Regions:
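Flexible "arm" and connector segments at domain edges
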Residues: 1-39, 43-101
Length: 101
C-alpha cells in the first residue's frame, strides 16, 4: 500500500467519523456504536500508516500522553485558554520520539 493511498484512507475514515458524530449529535445516544466503529476504523488506518512507515505508534502515543500530562500548572490542574484548549504549563516537556523512527 502506498503512503498516498493510506493517507486517502485516513481522510476517508475521518470523513466517515465526522458523519457518524454529526448523526449522533442530531439523533442521540442510540447511535454511539456507529460513531465508535468509525473512530476505531480511523485509528486502525492510522496504525496501518505507522506500520508502513516502520513507526512505533503505541510508544509514541505513550510519550505524547506523558508530555500532555506535563502541561499541568503548578497546582496540578490544567491551564485553559478561553476556547478551552489546554495550554503548556511551567513543567511542560515535549515528547522525544527520535528513537522511534
Amino acid at each position: 500500500m502506498t503512503r498516498s493511498y493510506q493517507k486517502d484512507l485516513i481522510v476517508e475514515e475521518f470523513k466517515e467519523f465526522l458523519e457518524a458524530d454529526g448523526f449522533l449529535f442530531k439523533h442521540g445516544a442510540n447511535h454511539q456504536e456507529d460513531c465508535l466503529k468509525e473512530l476505531a476504523d480511523l485509528v486502525y488506518v492510522c496504525y496501518q500508516y505507522a506500520e508502513n512507515m516502520h513507526w512505533f505508534l503505541d510508544a509514541a502515543l505513550d510519550r505524547v500522553h506523558q508530555s500532555n500530562m506535563s502541561k499541568l500548572g503548578e497546582d496540578g490542574k490544567p491551564i485553559y485558554r478561553e476556547d478551552g484548549k489546554v495550554l503548556k504549563g511551567p513543567s511542560y516537556k515535549p515528547p522525544d520520539l527520535s528513537d522511534l523512527i
